[in-house]
């Protein structure tokens, strides 16, 4: 794919299983979203979890039970087919990965779209801040931390973060740029000290791929929407569906419409 393709065109390819890889760098001008789909019985408590933990779980859209089209963020899209790779969970255990969840989706399911840090990557690169996972053609590095989120009903989780190595002299620029995107996790939660988050080895992420951290660079950590997936697993619902880490839903929402002045 090229960066010139529209979100609609990319989603069409994804729906045909022509793209099943991570979405970092795709449609760089448009916001991407984490996906959580679960039974309506759990929807309010999960919504409350997101509200209480808005840094890792900023809400872009919530679909009514049984609705498959995200009318606000991607009219005409289908939440059942337009994610490159889904994970299907039964009682907290991974049952399968799939590129189409039409057979699992029923009229009682509520879909949540939550902000993603891929949204601000184009602004970083546009300002001369390198994004290593894009440079190396990898998924972003994600780590489970020692910080606990506020619980809600059966939902609880440790905070998950992404890490991007930033040249030392560009760290403040990266902080300023990303702080404008509160619906894409906003400013970093930690700069330069993985140990403070309980991260022992940057070369061993819990999700995604390891990336190169060069001399003269600082590891910078942002809250991550995979936190929401861990929260859902903690509740052990009979069935829930999430995106596979790094395989996001691409919306029609321009990044800049999510940015503060």
Swiss-Prot record:
Enzyme class, first EC level, given as a word: lyase
Keywords tagged on the record: Lyase
EC number from the UniProt entry: 4.2.1.-
Molecular function via GO: lyase activity
Pfam families per record: D-Glu_cyclase
Similarity comment: family membership: Belongs to the D-glutamate cyclase family.
Protein name: Putative hydro-lyase Sfum_3393
């Amino acid at each position: 794919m090229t960066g010139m393709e529209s979100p609609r065109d990319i989603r069409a390819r994804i729906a045909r299983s022509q793209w099943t890889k991570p979405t970092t760098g795709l449609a760089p001008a448009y916001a991407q979203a984490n996906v959580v789909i679960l039974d309506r019985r759990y929807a309010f408590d999960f919504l409350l979890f997101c509200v209480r933990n808005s840094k890792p779980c900023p809400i872009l859209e919530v679909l009514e039970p049984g609705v498959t089209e995200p009318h606000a963020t991607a009219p005409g899209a289908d939440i059942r087919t337009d994610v490159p790779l889904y994970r299907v969970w039964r009682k907290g255990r991974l049952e399968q990965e799939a590129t189409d969840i039409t057979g699992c989706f029923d009229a009682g399911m509520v879909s949540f779209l939550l902000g993603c840090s891929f949204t601000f990557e184009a602004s970083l690169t546009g300002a001369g801040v390198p994004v290593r996972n894009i440079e190396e053609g990898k998924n972003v590095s994600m780590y489970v931390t020692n910080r606990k989120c506020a619980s809600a009903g059966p939902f609880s989780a440790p905070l998950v973060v992404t890490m991007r190595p930033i040249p030392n002299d560009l760290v403040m620029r990266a902080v300023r740029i990303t702080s404008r995107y509160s619906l894409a996790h906003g400013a970093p939660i930690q700069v330069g000290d993985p140990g403070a988050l309980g991260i022992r080895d940057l070369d061993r992420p819990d999700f995604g791929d390891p990336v190169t951290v060069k001399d003269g660079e600082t590891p910078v950590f942002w809250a991550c929407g995979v936190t929401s997936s861990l929260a859902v697993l903690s509740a052990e619902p009979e069935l829930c569906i999430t995106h596979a880490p790094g395989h996001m839903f691409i919306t029609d929402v321009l990044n800049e419409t999510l940015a503060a002045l």
